[in-house]
């Protein structure tokens, strides 16, 4: 197994164990979606209209909740220093850690979306559209959030700084994710533009995120 594959497998295994963060994100996502019908009342039409936004907001907050452990656990046990000084390019290591985080914490949210959509009175087409937009957009949340996680890892009260840094960068993803979901529900003809922008945001974050995170780690750990 290559060093890259070993790093991804290790991070997934750590995230999936008790206290690793992946389960916390899924439970938080479930809690947000389950509580919303009680807060909005028995209006099923209102639930269906707000359903995509609720699912996207829950996914955003759940992702933010687990991002603080992206580098923190490695920093606490000293393995982050080994990663920084290792032979593998740090940018590639950051990309591998972000991919492992998305597989462990982001992908389960997408899998749970069709079931949770039933609680929001969404039909099969609507839940499928939301799941597709989450599949395209949640990588942007992870790779953008990785930059904030790298900046916060060496700072006191880094979790608060992480929220301040990541939330503004996540707003475009949230806007176009909800817009694409609503467009797919309204009619497929208007789905292409916001969905294409959402995919572009993920691709841009995939390119920029590892380099920005690696630079932050090098500067913070010097």
What are the functions of these language-model segments?
Residues 1-25:
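Aromatic- and glycine-rich beta-strand/loop motifs that create alpha-glucan
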Residues 19-41, 56-59, 165-176, 202-209:
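Hydrophobic alpha-helical transmembrane segments of multi-pass membrane transport/permease proteins
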Residues 39-50, 114-135, 181-195, 220:
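Membrane-interfacial helix-loop-helix connectors in multipass membrane proteins
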Residues 51-67, 71:
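Long, hydrophobic alpha-helical segments
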Residues 64-84:
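Transmembrane helix boundary and interhelical loop/hinge segments in multi-pass membrane proteins
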Residues 95-120, 140, 144, 177-178:
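Hydrophobic alpha-helical transmembrane segments that constitute the membrane-spanning cores
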Residues 128, 133-167, 218-222:
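A structural motif at transmembrane helix-loop-helix junctions in multipass membrane proteins
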Residues 205-222:
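Junction motif at the cytosolic side of a transmembrane helix
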């Amino acid at each position: 197994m290559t060093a890259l594959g070993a790093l991804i497998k290790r991070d997934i295994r750590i995230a999936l164990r008790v206290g690793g963060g992946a389960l916390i994100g899924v439970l938080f996502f479930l809690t947000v979606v389950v509580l919303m019908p009680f807060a909005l009342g028995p209006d099923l039409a209102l639930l269906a209209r707000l359903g995509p936004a609720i699912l996207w907001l829950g996914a955003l907050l759940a992702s933010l909740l687990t991002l603080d452990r992206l580098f923190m656990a490695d920093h606490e046990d000293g393995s982050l220093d080994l990663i920084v000084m290792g032979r593998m390019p740090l940018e590639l290591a950051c990309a591998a850690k972000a991919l492992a985080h998305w597989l462990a914490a982001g992908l389960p949210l997408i899998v749970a979306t069709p079931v949770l959509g039933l609680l929001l009175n969404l039909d099969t087409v609507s839940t499928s559209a939301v799941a597709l937009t989450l599949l395209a957009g949640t990588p942007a949340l992870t790779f953008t959030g990785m930059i904030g996680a790298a900046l916060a890892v060496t700072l006191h009260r880094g979790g608060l700084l992480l929220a301040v840094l990541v939330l503004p960068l996540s707003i475009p993803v949230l806007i176009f994710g909800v817009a694409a979901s609503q467009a797919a529900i309204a009619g497929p003809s208007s789905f292409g533009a916001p969905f294409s922008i959402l995919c572009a945001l993920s691709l841009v974050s995939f390119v920029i995120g590892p380099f920005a995170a690696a630079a932050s780690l090098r500067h913070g750990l010097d």
